[in-house]
Every structure is written in structure tokens, then in C-alpha cells.
Amino acid sequence: MAKAKFERTKPHVNIGTIGHIDHGKTTLTAAITRVLHDKFPELNKASAFDQIDKAPEERQRGITISIAHVEYQTEARHYAHVDCPGHADYIKNMITGAAQMDGAILVVAATDGPMPQTKEHVILARQVGVPYIVVALNKADMVEDEELLELVEMEVRELLSSYEFPGDDVPVVRVSALKALEGDAEWGDKLMELMDAVDTAIPEPERAIDQPFLMPIEDVFTITGRGTVVTGRIERGVLNVNQEVEVVGIKPTSTKTTVTSIEMFNKMLDTGQAGDNAALLLRGLKRDDVERGQVVVKPGSITPHTEFEGQAYILSKDEGGRHTPFYNNYRPQFYFRTTDVTGVVSLPEGTEMVMPGDNTEMKVDLIQPIAMEEGLKFAIREGGRTVGAGRVVKILK
């Protein structure tokens, strides 16, 4: 059979399964691939459960995470789906954004209802900005009592509402991942119903190219007679020659300038877009006016800040992290995009210290401003060695 070619025509969405241990996240992931394979064989191959469960370890910024990646297609969309076998892997993945999610399938066993990790994953989803959730009420074949199913559904909705998800409107679909995986037609249909809910309740993400222009500066140099050139990889948006931009971060004030030329691989271009490695010639700026760590952006689209609340995972000793805990007023470097800035950490009330391998909330006060928005990722470093990773949850100043 000819290999199905990757069609660019379909919208692409990143999702993942979250929820308490043994509630059936991995079984559900395998069942989705099986049911979609049976329904659209030319679009999908089935993934075996044990392949997903024995997820290969990945190292992202020094953090070891087991993540299984599967892909599949519904009629409407192409999905990349992540599933993590261990609870610690989920926490690390969600905080560090190793695999970004546009939405999540929250798996809750109808036999148990919401459990501690269910709640923990929902809290994390809220904090790290997983924007949409669809609920799979799994093992529904094992609960005879309709009232009990309704009760569990109500509990899940209340849990979601208490963390600012629209609990009353979130789709809750009763499924049996195991039965569907075994090929039971009726439960297979319920799984299709779940995927229809995912298709409709998780909106298509805004593509990087449609967002406001942003390029982190990696390098700065002068071309005699022409001016100052900055290089970097365009993170989002589109830039045209002669467009006005703003240089933001590190320095106390932002600077507006015009891009008079865009080059890629030594060729002059009219435009640059998300994903391009580009060199931009900036009008009227001296070599000392710009530096690595700043960003070139669409004017007014992002602002510099020094204080934020973050959620971070601190590497364990085995991952090459610290061997000892840290305390209030810890002063590491925070690495944003292309540069390190020193920051002072304040721990939440009641937290005396943070151990290697923990995840924690923290308030950070940076000594220089960084172009920042909620969701921005950072690494925590000591002398160039990564000891943690996290993201901005809320900007304070």
C-alpha cells in the first residue's frame, strides 16, 4: 500500500491525554488510533498499546521525560497526540511545554470519579494555559447505575468550573477505551463521538504566521556603510521590508526603527516569516543600541517586564540538577529565548524550601526587563547549567 502523504490542507492540532494514574489514558490513546484506523484506514495506522506505554525517554533542556507521540486524522483534522506513562512525566511535560497542547482530553474513570491527580492535572492545565478540555468518562461499561454515572459527570464538571474552565459546557463523553480497543462496535461508536467532540470543542489554534511579528535577537553586527544587522529565527508573524518594528527588552526603554533589508542565506528577500532564519538591517541604530536577548517585534505587540509569577519544575539530582534544596531569595539566572537574566525568587507562603525534583510556584523579580507575555517559557540556570524549567503564569510588573 502506498504511504499516505502528509496533507497540509487539513488543520493541524496538538492534543494530549491527562488524568489520574490507571484511569486509562494510554488505553484511550491506543483505542483512538485503532477506531480511527478502522473507520479511515487510508488516513490512519493503528498504534499498539505497549508501544505507547513504553514511551521513549526524551531529553528536553536536560529534563528526562517519557512521552509517547502518536498521530492520527479525523475527517476534519490532523492530530498530534501526546501521552505520558508516568505522573511525574505529565507534570514535567505540562510545566516545561516539551509538547505544547492546544487542548486536552481529561480521562476520568467512571468507577472512581475525580482523584487527586485528576485535580492536579486540571490545576496545571489552568496554570500553564491548556486552553480547552474535553472529558472522556472512561470504563463506563463497568458502571451499571445510570445515576452513578451522572453523579461522576457532575463531580468532574464542578472540578473544572472551580478552576475556571467552563464546566457546564465542556463535552463529557462516556467511553470504554478497553472495549473499543478490543473492537467492540458500540463502544467504537462512542469513541468516534468523543473525537467529534474534540473536533468541535477544541478550536483550531492560531498559526504562528498569523500572530504579531516577533524575532529574538541572537547576534548583532555592523556592516560598514550600511548599518546594524541583527540575526535570529523568526518566531511568529510576517515581516516586510520597510516595515516599522520595535526592539524590546533588556534596556530600560524600547526603540522603534525600520527594517530596510531582510536577508536569508545571503539572498535579499521582500518578506520573512515564522520559521525563517533571517538577518534584518535596522535603520539608524548603532551597534550598541541592540543586544542579544532583546526581541524585534511589531510595535506595541509585547511589553518589557521584570516581575512575574511562574510555575517551574526543578531538575532532580539524577537529571543533572541541584543536589540540595533552595530557599527564599534564591538568585539563579533565568534564560528567556536567547539570554540569561538574574532574578530573585520568592517562594509561596508556607513553602520553606524547594527540593530537586519538585515543582513549585514562584514569584520572580528580574534585574533587567524581558519582553514577556503569559505562557513564555524559561530555563533556570546556575553558571550555564540548567537546574529547572518553567513558564510565566502571570505578569506582575
From Swiss-Prot:
Belongs to the TRAFAC class translation factor GTPase superfamily. Classic translation factor GTPase family. EF-Tu/EF-1A subfamily. Residues 83-86 are annotated as: G3. Residues 176-178 are annotated as: G5. This is Elongation factor Tu. SUPFAM superfamilies: EF-Tu/eEF-1alpha/eIF2-gamma C-terminal domain, P-loop containing nucleoside triphosphate hydrolases, Translation proteins. The keyword Signal does not apply. Keywords: Cytoplasm, Elongation factor, GTP-binding, Hydrolase, Magnesium, Metal-binding, Nucleotide-binding, Protein biosynthesis. The lineage of its organism: Bacteria, Bacillati, Actinomycetota, Actinomycetes, Kineosporiales. Monomer. GTP hydrolase that promotes the GTP-dependent binding of aminoacyl-tRNA to the A-site of ribosomes during protein biosynthesis. NCBIfam families: EF-Tu, PRK00049.1, PRK12735.1, PRK12736.1, small_GTP. Residues 138-141 are annotated as: G4. PROSITE patterns: G_TR_1, G_TR_2. It comes from Kineococcus radiotolerans (strain ATCC BAA-149 / DSM 14245 / SRS30216). Its EC number is 3.6.5.3. Pfam families: GTP_EFTU, GTP_EFTU_D2, GTP_EFTU_D3. Residues 19-26 are annotated as: G1.
